[in-house]
C-alpha cells in the first residue's frame, strides 16, 4: 500500500513536463502569475536578495509534497516526522551557513564592551537557540499538519453521521479544508525560513 510504483513516477514526471516545458500557453501564464504573486507575498530584501527565491522554492516544494502525497496516497508526507525533520534540517542548515558566511556573524558573537562572562553566557544561549530551530520547525509543521488532518476528518465524520452519507459536498468540503491547511502550513514554514535568512 505504501509502495511507489513505476506508473506513479512516470505520471509525476509526465505532469511535471507540462508545468515546466511549455514556453507559451495558458498554463505557463498561470504559473508565472502565481510565482510573481508569491514573490510579492514573501517580499524582497535588499540585504539578502535571494531570500524570497529560497522561500518561494520552499513553499512550492512543500505544496508539491503535500498535494502529491494527499491526492495519490491520502496521506501527506509533511505529517511524517522523518520527512519533516530532514527537510527542516536542510532548510535550517542553509540559513545557518548563510549566517555564518556573513559579516554579521563575527560581530554577533563578540560585541565590543562586553565582559568575557557575558559573552560566554550569551554565546551558549545563542547556540542553544540556533540548534533548537530545526526541532521547532519539525514539531510545528508535523503537528499542525496532523492536527489539521484530524480536525477536518472529525468534522467530516460528524457531519456525515448527522446528515447521512448521501451528501457528496461533505467530502469536497473536507478535502478543501485539508488543502487550506496545506497552504497555511507551507506558508508558515517557508516564512520562518525567510525570517531566519533575514536575521
UniProtKB/Swiss-Prot annotation:
Alphabetical keyword list? ATP synthesis, CF(0), Hydrogen ion transport, Ion transport, Membrane, Mitochondrion, Mitochondrion inner membrane, Transmembrane, Transmembrane helix, Transport
Gene Ontology biological-process annotations: proton motive force-driven ATP synthesis
- Cellular compartment(s): Mitochondrion inner membrane
A UniProt-annotated Pfam family: ATP-synt_A
Tell me what the record says results from residue 90 to I.
In strain: VT847
Check the record and name the InterPro entries matching this protein: ATP_synth_F0_asu, ATP_synth_F0_asu_AS, ATP_synth_F0_asu_bact/mt, F0_ATP_A_sf
Q: What GO molecular functions are on record for this protein? A: proton transmembrane transporter activity
Task: State whether it acts alone or in a complex, and with which partners, per the record.
Answer: F-type ATPases have 2 components, CF(1) - the catalytic core - and CF(0) - the membrane proton channel. CF(1) has five subunits: alpha(3), beta(3), gamma(1), delta(1), epsilon(1). CF(0) has three main subunits: a, b and c.
Protein's UniProt name: ATP synthase subunit a
Q: What gene does the UniProt entry assign to this protein?
A: atp6
Amino acid at each position: 500500500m505504501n509502495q511507489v510504483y513505476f506508473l506513479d513516477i512516470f505520471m509525476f514526471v509526465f505532469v511535471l513536463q507540462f508545468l515546466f516545458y511549455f514556453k507559451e500557453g495558458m498554463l505557463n501564464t498561470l504559473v508565472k502569475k502565481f510565482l510573481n504573486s508569491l514573490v510579492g507575498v514573501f517580499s524582497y530584501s535588499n540585504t539578502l536578495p535571494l531570500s524570497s527565491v529560497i522561500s518561494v522554492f520552499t513553499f512550492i516544494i512543500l505544496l508539491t509534497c503535500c498535494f502529491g502525497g494527499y491526492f495519490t496516497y491520502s496521506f501527506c508526507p509533511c505529517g511524517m516526522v522523518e520527512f519533516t525533520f530532514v527537510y527542516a534540517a536542510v532548510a535550517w542548515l542553509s540559513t545557518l551557513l548563510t549566517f555564518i558566511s556573513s559579516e554579521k556573524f563575527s560581530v554577533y558573537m563578540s560585541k565590543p564592551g562586553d565582559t568575557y562572562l557575558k559573552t560566554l553566557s550569551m554565546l551558549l544561549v545563542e547556540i542553544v537557540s540556533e540548534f533548537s530551530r530545526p526541532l521547532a520547525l519539525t514539531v510545528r509543521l508535523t503537528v499542525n499538519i496532523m492536527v489539521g488532518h484530524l480536525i477536518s476528518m472529525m468534522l467530516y465524520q460528524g457531519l456525515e453521521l448527522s446528515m447521512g452519507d448521501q451528501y457528496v459536498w461533505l467530502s469536497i468540503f473536507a478535502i478543501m479544508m485539508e488543502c487550506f491547511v496545506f497552504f497555511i502550513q507551507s506558508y508558515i514554514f517557508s516564512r520562518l525560513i525567510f525570517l531566519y535568512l533575514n536575521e
